[in-house]
């Protein structure tokens, strides 16, 4: 039996982070977590990390699609926060967003990690961006590193 598992260190990889400006007070924590993991665990240099700010989560997919066609990056990380309001707008965003991102990843054979929070309230978002429940930006970074390395050995 053969077992394959991607490692976390990927010091020569180039990563693009696409991050939403909306809810930036939360998203900046996600970004800090992602960058820390890429540098400290993945051993990436700052010059191998590119950050693209977009207005909101809905604008992330077009940049992901554009960057995936350039063959410049080994992996992409998406960061943002969608907090449930009084309408069902958040449900539409979450379903469509994930489907679009997953389709791009499969079509372009590029690891794309989703570090977008979908929460019921602001407290849940804060907890997932670096307090009680860890940092989902860091988790997204580790996931993309592992997938980059797994694809290299398959």
UniProtKB/Swiss-Prot annotation:
Pathway as given in its UniProt record: Cofactor biosynthesis; riboflavin biosynthesis; riboflavin from 2-hydroxy-3-oxobutyl phosphate and 5-amino-6-(D-ribitylamino)uracil: step 1/2
Catalytic activity reported: (2S)-2-hydroxy-3-oxobutyl phosphate + 5-amino-6-(D-ribitylamino)uracil = 6,7-dimethyl-8-(1-D-ribityl)lumazine + phosphate + 2 H2O + H(+)
Transmembrane segments: none
One Gene Ontology MF term: 6,7-dimethyl-8-ribityllumazine synthase activity
UniProt keyword list: Riboflavin biosynthesis, Transferase
Transferase among keywords: yes
The enzyme's E.C. designation: 2.5.1.78
NCBIfam families xref list: lumazine-synth, PRK00061.1-4
Physiological role: Catalyzes the formation of 6,7-dimethyl-8-ribityllumazine by condensation of 5-amino-6-(D-ribitylamino)uracil with 3,4-dihydroxy-2-butanone 4-phosphate. This is the penultimate step in the biosynthesis of riboflavin.
Record's protein name: 6,7-dimethyl-8-ribityllumazine synthase
Primary gene name: ribH
